Amino acid sequence: MVKRTHGYRYKSRKLLSKKPRERGVPGLSRLLYEYKPGDKVVIDVDPTFVSTAPHRRYQGKVGVVIGTRGRAYVIETYIGDKKKIIVTTPEHLKPFQGGS
């Protein structure tokens, strides 16, 4: 028997697929939204843009913008007690709408 491989997008069929009405490129308001350092954002992976997508474990996580790197944003978030730094483009970010 051969061991099955577990790639980068392993177990993400439902998570990284769009419903028929959501297919295609998202609106310009989402793509051109500018975040400032200190803004809270939600990581919402858009499967249309594969090369800049963060790992699926960060889907739905809330983070803080700590800077930019070219066109991308540097996001600080936590997985348990560990601080993680994510570098991703605005296609995969939404402004955080919750409380403080």
Swiss-Prot record:
Q: Does the keyword Chaperone apply?
A: no
Keyword Transmembrane included in the entry's annotation: no
Entry keyword set: Ribonucleoprotein, Ribosomal protein
SUPFAM superfamilies cross-referenced by the UniProt entry = Translation proteins SH3-like domain
**Pfam families, alphabetically?**
Ribosomal_L21e (PF01157)
The alphabetized list of GO BP terms reads:
translation
An example of a Gene Ontology cellular component annotation for this protein is: ribosome
State the source organism's domain of life: Archaea
**Cited InterPro entries:** Ribosomal_eL21, Ribosomal_eL21_arc, Ribosomal_eL21_CS, Ribosomal_eL21_sf, Translation_prot_SH3-like_sf
Q: Please give the family membership noted in the entry.
A: Belongs to the eukaryotic ribosomal protein eL21 family.
PANTHER family, A to Z: 60S RIBOSOMAL PROTEIN L21
Q: What is this protein called?
A: Large ribosomal subunit protein eL21
Gene that codes for this? rpl21e
